[in-house]
């Protein structure tokens, strides 16, 4: 990393001005200053000079910024207004003892669409989006797949897999922490099950799909979650079967396996680095006075550990009359609940498993937008790496 260690004396006029009394600033110090700057400041600094732009593109800097961002995760919101999808984020409160002051949402980017859209669970600072769009020369909308980075405002349209199947099933987004690779898994339907499975690896010179084999007949049933390099998603044996399972896809080795589940699951979450399932006694929204969390013990033996949580009656004063759904779980083991029918003012709720306490946090700055309850994501990080 010789270029990182050199001094900026050759470009002092760009960084320090023309005053010869100043000593040149080491690149390491410049990088450290930038790593503490807000993500929007990074975008502006890229336009100041070629030297600054080159510094902010160094792999060392982007990795350093990402590492620091992981220590301050954010809530990511996808909001719909007319035919545009807007991305906002707020700091994610991680200290159960801190006061629940209102949080101001920051706008990042928007995506136009012409029909339906679907957001696959984001990973790190990247978001995988599928949306309908009327392409040039066409009269009807077609689905487009894209990888977006809300922090930089960039998006990358993915090529379509070459397949004869007309009925496309679903897609998932995974990350291999060993090889540090993002991968997209896509499947299409034939005879009631997924017949063809394709993988695309991001970061390669030529983006292309590779067909892989899967020996487990299944059809998709829920959004997935990637934990420690394994992508999990709920599925059925076929479109007409009531047999449920959780399919496991090893992102690095691109191999499939499955886990039996004892109860229908509402939300898959990560609990202390393990797969867990939140189960409510009733519909998909929260009702009643208790819920269960099933934590995967031994995946090879299909063993689950059951935890039951009782809701205190006085919580009704905090929750109000809203119907709530599970949005996920934070790294500090707080379950995040969001309204099924968002209103103004807009709140999210944090339930602490260890303390058996709940707090309400107001989110400001999105009043003019429709917040879709299915598109509130936890542990989003700001990534300044350009796509």
UniProtKB/Swiss-Prot annotation:
Tissue: Strongly expressed in guard cells. Mostly represented in seedlings, leaves and flowers, and, to a lower extent, in roots and siliques.
Gene disruption: observed consequences: Hypersensitive ABA response of stomatal closing and substantial increase of drought tolerance.
Record pathway: Protein modification; protein ubiquitination
GO biological process: abscisic acid-activated signaling pathway; cellular response to water deprivation; negative regulation of abscisic acid-activated signaling pathway; protein ubiquitination; regulation of stomatal movement; response to abscisic acid; response to water deprivation; stomatal movement
Pfam families named in the record: F-box, FBA_3
Segments forming domain F-box: 19-64
Cysteines joined through disulfide linkages: none
Keywords, in A-Z order: Abscisic acid signaling pathway, Ubl conjugation pathway
Matching PANTHER family: BNAA05G37150D PROTEIN-RELATED, F-BOX PROTEIN DOR
Domain notes: The F-box is necessary for the interaction with ASK proteins.
NCBIfam families: F_box_assoc_1 (TIGR01640)
Job of this protein: Component of SCF(ASK-cullin-F-box) E3 ubiquitin ligase complexes, which may mediate the ubiquitination and subsequent proteasomal degradation of target proteins. Negative regulator of guard cell abscisic acid (ABA) signaling, especially during drought stress.
Protein name (database record): F-box protein DOR
Originating species: Arabidopsis thaliana (Mouse-ear cress)
């Amino acid at each position: 990393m010789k270029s990182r260690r050199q001094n900026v004396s050759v470009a002092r006029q760009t960084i320090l001005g023309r005053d010869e009394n100043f000593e040149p600033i080491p690149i390491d110090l410049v990088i450290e200053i930038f790593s503490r700057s807000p993500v929007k400041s990074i975008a502006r600094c890229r336009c100041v000079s070629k030297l600054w732009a080159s510094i902010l593109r160094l792999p060392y800097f982007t990795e350093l910024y990402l590492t620091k961002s992981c220590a301050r995760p954010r809530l990511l919101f996808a909001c719909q207004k007319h035919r545009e999808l807007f991305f906002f984020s707020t700091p994610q409160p991680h200290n159960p003892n801190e006061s629940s002051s209102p949080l101001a949402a920051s706008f990042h980017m928007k995506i136009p669409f012409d029909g339906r859209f679907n957001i696959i669970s984001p990973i790190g600072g990247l978001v995988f989006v599928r949306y309908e769009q009327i392409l040039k020369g066409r009269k009807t909308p077609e689905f487009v797949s894209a990888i977006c980075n809300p922090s930089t405002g960039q998006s990358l349209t993915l090529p379509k897999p070459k397949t004869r199947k007309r009925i496309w099933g679903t897609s998932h987004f995974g990350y291999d922490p060993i090889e540090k690779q993002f991968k997209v898994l896509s499947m299409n339907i034939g005879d009631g099950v997924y017949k063809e499975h394709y993988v695309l690896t991001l970061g390669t010179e030529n983006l292309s799909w590779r067909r892989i084999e899967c020996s487990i007949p299944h059809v998709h049933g829920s959004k997935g979650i990637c934990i420690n390099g394994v992508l999990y998603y709920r599925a059925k044996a076929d479109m007409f079967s009531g047999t449920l399972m959780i399919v496991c896809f090893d992102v690095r080795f691109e191999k499939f396996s499955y886990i039996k589940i004892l109860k229908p699951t509402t939300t898959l979450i990560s609990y202390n680095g393990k797969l867990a399932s939140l189960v409510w006694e009733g519909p998909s929204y929260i009702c009643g006075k208790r819920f269960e969390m099933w934590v995967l013990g031994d995946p090879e033996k299909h063993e689950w550990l059951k935890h039951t949580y009782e809701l205190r009656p006085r919580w009704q004063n905090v929750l109000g009359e809203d119907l709530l759904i599970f949005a996920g779980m934070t790294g500090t083991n707080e379950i995040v609940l969001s309204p099924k029918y968002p209103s103004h003012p807009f709140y999210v709720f944090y339930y602490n498993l260890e303390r058996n306490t709940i707090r309400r946090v107001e989110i400001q700055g999105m009043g003019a937008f429709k917040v879709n309850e299915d598109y509130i994501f936890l542990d989003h990080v700001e990534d300044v790496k350009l796509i």
